[in-house]
Amino acid sequence: MFNTLYPYGYMHTMNTIVRTTIFDEWLSHLKDVNGKAHIIKRIRSAERGNFGDRTALGQRVSEMRIHAGPGYRIYFMRIEATVYLLLCGGRKRGQQADILRAKQLARIYKEE
């Protein structure tokens, strides 16, 4: 009965999410426990291929919007087929500065 649940050859690929120390420091300093939980849940979804509400910002940088707290953002870039680098995080209020920072971090990563 359950032998035909998935077609033969079905394979689910997980994404690998790599975090910069800048991103880790930002996340660890968040005092909003509920917001932090939403961010971690969103990262887990991205590992399974569901990035949700995201926008390409140019220079290979994209933004994931988290609909919790003060409008958290995660800035990331794709570095391999299924590998993504979380560059930094921020809030809606500091969005423009965070975007510039993420693009700068992406340039530094590309140069290495």
Q: What do the predicted segments below correspond to?
A:
Residues 28-29:
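Surface-exposed, Lys/Arg-rich phosphate-binding patches that contact polyanionic backbones
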